[in-house]
Amino acid sequence: RAETAKEMAAIMPEGDSPRRKAGAMPAEYTHQIIAEKVYEKLPEEICSHARELFPFDLGAQGADIFYFLHPFRRRNLGKIFHNEKVYETFESFRKAAVGADNTVLSYIFGYITHYAADCIFHPYVYSLTQKMVDAEPTRRVRWHSYIESDLDTYFVKKFYRKGVNRFECRLRAGKGVPKGVA
């Protein structure tokens, strides 16, 4: 338990957690920041096709938005895209990219940053989640979401030197979903 508490303290600054910010989706900011940092490093030949930031930022949220939307009530689309239809999703992107305009390409590039970030961070998040569940098996907490939210706090402080409650990601400033993405 002490080891787990120390690990959590390293990423959970007191009183400044995104889960306390109304409307903040867990890991929304982490994915946004990673996408911004990747965008800064893209070679010009790729960057020239990803100039539209709103679809790029929307893509950076990946299928996470579908965890919170349940249009079919029976199946969670977020789980389907993350766990069952990964190949199909990327295959559809490959086909859509042929001859696509910059709106579609921007979205696809953003989505790729989301997938890459999940591949890097989810093993850590799952491991830490299991430690928290083992430490407090009777406590009903969504540890996975809490840990991801606290990673948001860490990255906002690291890269923007401000509290997460004062951070506004570019996606929230966007104006609607572009036609090519919808």
Over which residues does each language-model region extend?
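N-terminal amphipathic/basic-hydrophobic helices that include classical n-h-c signal peptides
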Residues: 1-24
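General structural signal for secondary-structure boundaries
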Residues: 18, 27, 86-89, 177-182
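N-terminal, motif-rich segments that launch catalysis or mediate targeting to/interaction with membranes
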Residues: 24-107, 124-169
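Non-membrane alpha-helical segments in proteins
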Residues: 108-112
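Short active-site segment of divalent metal-dependent hydrolases/proteases
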Residues: 113, 117, 121
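Long, charge-rich alpha-helical interaction segments
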Residues: 164-182
